Amino acid sequence: MGNKQKLKFEFMRGFVAIAIAIAVALIFIFICADDPAKALNCLLIRPIISNGALNVSSILTILGRMTPIIFTGLAVCVMFSANQFNLAGEGTVMAGGFVAALLAIYVPMAAGLHPVVCILVGAVVGGLLMLIPAIAKVKLNASEMVCSLMLNYVVLYVIMHFLSNVFADRSQGSTQTYPFLETAKVAKMVPGTELTWGFVIAIIATILVGFFMYRTRWGYTIRMIGINESFSKYSGMRVGGVIVLSQVIGGVLSGMGGAIEVLGRYNTFLWKDLPGYGWTGITVAILAKNNPLAIPFAALFIAYLNRGCELMSIYAGVPAEMIDIIQAVIFLFFAAEQFMSKTRQKMVVKETKEELAKKQQEAAVEGGNA
C-alpha cells in the first residue's frame, strides 16, 4: 500500500473509531439524560456556542485544558515511537507538579526566574523517575509496561505520605500544601480563565519535539528502533541507550506538563490521586498516530469533549465520566489491529489492480509505437 493510500486508510480508520465512540456515548446519554437533546447540545455545541453567541470563556477553558495533555501526548508519542509502552506518565506528571509546588512555596526567587526554575526542576524529576523503568528494561529485560504502571502507584503513595505528614497546611479543611508564592505562578494569558502561558510553552515544545523526531539523527534512530529493534541493533545503532533516551525525554515532558499545570491552575498543591493526564496522553498520542505535530489537534479534540462532558454534567445531569467512556472506546478500536482489516485488504487489492492495469496500458502503448 502506497503512502497516500495508507494515510487515507488511517484517516478513515480513525474517523470510524471516533464515530463509534461518539455513538456509544449517545446510547448512554439517551439512557441517563432526562432531556437527551439538551445533553447533546451541551456535549457538541455549547463548548463553543451558547445562547446563539460565541462562548469565549468556554473556548479559553478548552485551550487551557489542552496544555497538560499536549505535554503528556508528546511524552507518549516519543516513547511509543521507540516501541516503548511506558505508562508512567501519570506518576511523572504528579511528581513534577509536586516538586515544582514545593519550590514555589519554600524557595523564594525573583518573579521572572521562579516559575522557570520550578518548571525545569519538575521536568528533571520526571526524567529521573523515567530512568527506573528504562534501566530495568535495558539491564534486566523487565517489562517497561509493568514497571511503569507500578511506578505510578509508588509515586502516588510517596507523595501522599509527604503531603499528609510533612507539607500539609493544617489550617485548611482538606489535605493541601501552603499557598504558592506569587512569584512562582505561571501567569494567565487571559485573567480569570484557565488559559496560561503554559499553552505557548506547550506549542513550542510540540515544534521542538517534531524537529527532534524528524530532523535529527537521534529522532531517526528512535523511530527506526520502534519499527524494527533487531534490524537497528544489527545496523550498529545503540539500541539500549536510545531506549533509555526515549523514556527519559517522555519523563521530562510529562514532568514539565505537571509543573506548568500545578503552578498555572492552582494556588496550592491539592492532588490526592493520579491526575489522569497520563492516560489521556495515551489517547492523544494514539489519535495523532505518534506524530508530534498532530498532538495539539488531538489534544484539542479531547479537551473539547472534556469540556462538553463537563457542561453536560452541569446542565443535563449526565455524569462527566462520559469522557472516560469515549476515550476507552477510541483506545479499544485504535489498539485492535484487525479493526477494518478487510477494508485495508480491499484497498490494497484495488490499488494493485489499478497499478497492473496502468502498466498493461503503458505496455500496449509502447508496443503500438514500436
Regions found by a protein language model. Name each.
Residues 28-34, 42, 47-106, 127-142, ...:
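Single transmembrane alpha-helix segments in multi-pass membrane proteins
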Residues 248-328:
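Transmembrane alpha-helical segments in multi-pass inner-membrane proteins
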Residues 191-268, 292-293, 297:
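Helix-loop-helix "hairpin" substructures at the membrane interface of multi-pass membrane proteins
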Residues 1-20, 26-30, 227, 234-241, ...:
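Cytosolic-side transmembrane-helix boundaries in multi-pass membrane proteins
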Residues 144, 148, 152-215, 322:
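Transmembrane helix-bundle core of multi-pass membrane transporters
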Residues 34-38, 80-96, 138-147, 266-279, ...:
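Short, non-helical or kinked segments that cap or interrupt transmembrane helices
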Residues 2-12, 80-88, 110-173, 215, ...:
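Short loop segments and helix-boundary regions at transmembrane helix junctions
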Residues 19, 66-77, 92-98, 124-131, ...:
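Hydrophobic alpha-helical segments embedded in the membrane of multi-pass proteins
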